[in-house]
Amino acid sequence: MTKALLIYLVSSFLALNQASLISRCDLAQVLQLEDLDGFEGYSLSDWLCLAFVESKFNISKINENADGSFDYGLFQINSHYWCNDYKSYSENLCHVDCQDLLNPNLLAGIHCAKRIVSGARGMNNWVEWRLHCSGRPLFYWLTGCRLR
């Protein structure tokens, strides 16, 4: 199955079911197809752990922060720094509308997360990843997933 077809099928399934959740193994397949395994030294398990601790695999999650900014999507990407929600000032370092981070095809969120991880702090940009994933054995995140 081609990369584009798999992403299309996963996003179609989510849209048809009006679901905002993606399964752990479906997400692992998409992340692998987008070459995140080993990206900047992080494993697929790191990415899965990040998505779980930030959003519980909820693609459409939006969270308001105490400073008035919002976090969007699977990776809870912040509107003050990374995306523009047109509600308050944003540096918009990913050059993306925050609403695009809620898209079931996941690509806008993945591309922005890759940009964030490419910076000096890597996944340490996410407090929840530091608290719950960093330095821990994460092999179980891929248990039962059939990857290519």
UniProtKB/Swiss-Prot annotation:
Its EC number is 3.2.1.17. It comes from Homo sapiens (Human). This is Lysozyme-like protein 6. SUPFAM superfamilies: Lysozyme-like. The gene is LYZL6. SMART domains: LYZ1 (SM00263). May be involved sperm-egg plasma membrane adhesion and fusion during fertilization. Exhibits bacteriolytic activity in vitro against Micrococcus luteus and Staphylococcus aureus. Shows weak bacteriolytic activity against Gram-positive bacteria at physiological pH. Bacteriolytic activity is pH-dependent, with a maximum at around pH 5.6. It holds the Pfam family Lys. GO terms for biological process: defense response to bacterium; fertilization; fusion of sperm to egg plasma membrane involved in single fertilization; killing of cells of another organism. Keywords: Antimicrobial, Bacteriolytic enzyme, Cell projection, Cilium, Disulfide bond, Fertilization, Flagellum, Glycosidase, Hydrolase, Secreted, Signal.
